[in-house]
Design a protein with these regions (language model features):
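A short glycine-rich, Lys/Arg-flanked "PGG" loop and its adjoining helix->strand segment in the class I
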Residues: 145-160
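Class I SAM-dependent methyltransferase SAM/SAH-binding core
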Residues: 64-120
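Core SAM-dependent methyltransferase catalytic element
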Residues: 227-229, 243-267
Length: 267
């Protein structure tokens, strides 16, 4: 099965199923949240439940061209749109994008939605955005280098990339031992993918959920730097739904900047 599996198509269907299962990251914000955002009282998350520091954002979000990357679900996009941003939500799941469309229709928000693979942002011209907002999602993407390269391309000079990702070290543990007995049994090497498991074991541990990829910190942080970004901030948070929360960070979030355009010296 795994030899012929298309991870993008598989994860598209898997995330559509997560909408049916009411996964917490598929629940749209209520009208009270967007109403407050319209008055300037807003927050969004990249990792866990901790709001992103406001100083990570542009000085004014009003009028900023924002790409909410792999960020469907009717959460971050509507909040930023209500706060005054020009928002495009890009996601691999039609059902997740439908959540954003529902909130936009309900609350009178202008949000553009685009379906696709986060490694291919060819729907957008170079320098289209002031901010790429990418909450935890690249765990479902097979390779990271194209993601960072595309983010760099579609950002304007001095544009911002805010991204969240899982701690790769979470994947060294046997998932069944961790989730059923809260036992830390070291079993896997990183980088790891759930596709590395025999199908029967993968279904026991992950059901028919999305395929996951641990990646590495080199791929996450080093990849951003290799694409040309300058890293300015890094924070961590526990994975509260996981037994590891008592011992290690489960998430990291970074803020990176595309360097301003440099004028050639006067000749």
């Amino acid at each position: 099965m795994t030899e012929n599996l298309d991870p993008v198509a598989y994860n598209r269907a898997a995330w559509d199923r997560e909408v049916d299962r009411d996964n917490e990251w598929t629940r749209p914000v209520g009208p009270d949240v967007t109403a407050r955002a319209r008055t300037g009282d807003w927050s969004v998350v990249l990792i866990g439940y901790e709001p992103v520091p406001r100083h990570w954002f542009p000085a004014s979000i009003k009028g900023a061209a924002v790409l909410c990357l792999a960020s469907g679900g009717g959460q971050q996009g509507p909040v930023l749109a209500a706060a005054g941003a020009d928002v495009t939500v890009f996601d691999n799941s039609p059902r997740q994008l439908a959540r954003d469309e529902q909130v936009a229709a309900r609350d009178g928000l202008a949000i553009r939605t685009v379906l696709g693979d986060m490694r291919d942002l060819s729907a957008f011209a170079d320098g289209s955005f002031d901010l790429v907002f990418n909450p935890v999602s690249n765990v479902f993407c097979p390779d990271l280098a194209p993601v960072w390269q595309e983010c760099f391309r579609v950002l304007r000079p001095a544009g911002l990339l805010l991204t969240g990702f899982l701690n790769p070290d979470l994947y060294i543990f046997d998932v069944e031992a961790l989730e059923t007995r809260a036992e830390f049994v070291v079993r896997h090497r990183v980088p790891f993918s759930t596709l590395d498991l025999p199908e029967a074991e993968r279904r026991r541990g992950y059901g028919d959920g999305p395929i996951e990829y641990s990646h590495t910190l080199t791929g996450q942080i080093g990849g951003q730097l290799a694409a040309g970004f300058v890293l300015t901030h890094l924070v961590e948070a526990p994975h509260q739904a996981d037994a590891t929360a008592r011992y290690m960070p489960g998430y990291f979030a970074t803020r990176a900047v595309k360097p301003p355009a440099v004028r050639p010296p006067a000749g």
